Amino acid sequence: YSKTSPKEKQKRGERALKMAYCYERSLQTQKAIASYKNAIRYEVAIPQNRLSYARLLLKNGEYKNAISEFQLVLDSLPGNKLALAGLESARNAPDIKQLGSRYTVKKMDVFNSRRSEYSPVLFGDQFDQLYFSSTRNEAEGDELSGITGTKPADIFVSQKDDKGKWSKPEQVQGGLNTAFDEGACTFSPDGREMYLTQCQSDASFPRYATIVKSARSDASWGKASEMKITNDTLTAYAHPAISPDGEWLYFVSDMTGGKGALDIWRVRFTTAGMGGVENLGSPINTEGDEMFPTFRPNGDFYFSSNGHPGMGGLDIFIAKVGADRKYHLEHP
């Protein structure tokens, strides 16, 4: 872009648009915003590009600018659900922000390293074990990711003692972790099985995220085996969650038939194996992305979404089953 003459407006605008897409995908929000501005200035941005720009403005807390952009998008794409949700979000966000939160968030240094830690889940009868994913140096494998520059993630665990102090996290032993990415684990209600996401790589053909299962023997987790949810090998299956009754596997996928790019689906465990997959549909899934499904023991269903009205980007939502046995969405 910087080496393209300003006189070549079309080419400069097209390159700005490609930069915006790359920055957006790599979560570099401010750089993506700047690149979208350039693409708009050179008049190469279509309404869908301006929708992406508006959603980034919302994510960045630029609510007034976001409102203007969402309104422009709706002039071209009347009724667009993501634009309508974004406009509602941008109008309500300042008041929600001013109200504050009843939760206090603080960093837990005992779990963190200089690398990435994510997807924590409590385990055990007393919830005194914390499993999470980390790309710290102790992870398996020698190769670094071409995307993150770090090692692939592994599952680590920390134990809380009688005094409430958490131990230094250790890599889960027993063959669970591999040289590939392991992350976002969950457990069966009886604690005997772990379900997690594994992302293998192969230079000869594309590989997609899969859900794998590990069985526990005493205190050790064994080598994981792949869960065959469908016969489609060109679809990603990730972020597993087991329903409190142990009958359903909830997961995230980009498979065809969804409402957005990423939806939450579920499949039932039967005596004959896995049943047919079901899309959760409304009010859970939107034209945006829904990810990271999680259950409380009482059945409350938590997930992340960037398609429902919120504060911008991925927000946390809760859904509860009503008397009609359907999910009802509550405020984030």
Predicted features along the sequence, with ranges:
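Amphipathic alpha-helical repeat scaffolds of TPR domains
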Residues: 11-18
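Canonical positions in the second alpha-helix
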Residues: 1-5, 38-39, 72-73
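Short, conserved micro-motifs composed of acidic
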Residues: 25, 52, 59, 63-64, ...
